[in-house]
Amino acid sequence: MRCFSYLWHTFSFERHSFATLRGYLLIMKLTHLLYTSAALAALPLAAFAQGNPSRPNLVFIMADQFRGDALDCLQQEPVQTPHLDQLASEGILFTEAVSSYPVSSPARAMLMTGMYPMANGVTGNCNSLNTPYGVELSTEAVCWSDVLKQAGYATAYIGKWHLDAPHPPYVDTYNNRGAVAWNEWCPPERRHGFDRWIAYGTYDNHLHPMYWDTLAGRDEFHYVNQWGPVYEADRAIEFIRTESVQSDRPFALVVSMNPPHTGYELVPDKYKRLYDSLDVEALARQKPYIPEKGTPEGDYFRANIRNYYACITGVDEQVGRIVQALKDCGLFENTLLVFTSDHGVCMGGHGVEGKNVFYEEAMRIPMICCWKGRLHPQRSDLPVAFADLYPTLLSLMGRKAEIPSTVQTHDWSRYFLQEQIQTPEDAFQPYYYCEPSDPTSGRRGIRTARYTYVVDVQKGKVTQTWLYDRTTDPGQLHNVAESQPARCDSLRQTLIQWLGKTHDPFVKYLTH
């Protein structure tokens, strides 16, 4: 009743191939839209009912820079996440989920397109340094949101987007006034099927965030004196309550929260106080990959970890509010609910403050998928990648036939439906790092259940190889590439086959 009472009162490949890539994507998108229009017209009217399990709602909540171990139920980090723990008990908690390119724009582009970086063109972060190289989400790509929009879903995107290239004159926000511009407006024609829009490109002042609303022009953004995740959860709950009375259509909602991204200190005091007594030195001693006190990265960890956990607990509380809104409105059982993150963060570990590396703290992400009555609650070590959620979720939602042929990432839906998920022994995930300004340089790798194998290439020449045995060396402290050449050769062949299969031109640097 709370839901309806509220509504009664409140209706509120390389650079030269870029043009070819755009043309190909445009052809595929037009073909796809024609196909799905015909398929949609053939559906019986009964299929459009809000409660029809063949047309479930989708609520996709993602944080930014949220480490895979940072859930209290995993007992790996001293962090408080009661709402996510509860959600994990009601759904599938994937303990080995990863981000294949652990940095914002590339990870998000892979999620939206189901294509790897050299295919979707987002080979680095969307900022003014990379604008000359065409680094932004293509309008011609068929995103999963395009598929759902074409299928009759009401769609909304709330929060961080970070898939548009900044162009001068830059939008007048603080993070566009330095040497590198980061923030950019996303015009309606670039929103890939999202009708409701309360978003920004990238903006890290979490206590005073800015947003563009659906009809706002480029210079018509507004600021909010509220912690970003709270504001975004408020807007998400409004959308859910409004859509709950629309019995003729399902909905797809994305809530993209920026915390626990930097700045970690920009979090309400009520969450900070929860970690005042945390013994940071004892915690650092438990993590052998954290440098000693008095080193730059060691001090970085000690200065920020309390606030990082505070951000996570704040995000957890907002997730709980959104889940409760679904339950209050009677939508929880017909909603496929996902919580995850675009990547993790090293937080000073291995001498790295940020991410964009192959260490577990950067690659591993939380992933919870809940659909009451359809997905069996359990923990699974299935190595699902952030980017795999495109085909996997659409298949679970009954839209497998509408997944475009451009999608490269893996559909795990048949495993999701198993009462006890059986992980394939040969399962692995790729790792990417690209140089947008120099396609002859970068890194490629694979992460298996036991090993992390990565090759660095500069100007077309292999310069370094890393091999970590995470079973005997979970902290990834010892590169054993030189002492295990046979293992490296085997993994190299697997990587070469993968790059060939996905038409990554980087393969030529590993085969000569």
Q: Which stretches of residues belong to each language-model region?
A:
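Formylglycine-dependent sulfatase
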Residues: 29, 34, 38, 47-457, ...
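Bacterial Sec-dependent N-terminal signal peptides
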Residues: 1-53
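Conserved, charge-rich beta-strand/loop surface module that forms ligand/interface-binding patches
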Residues: 471
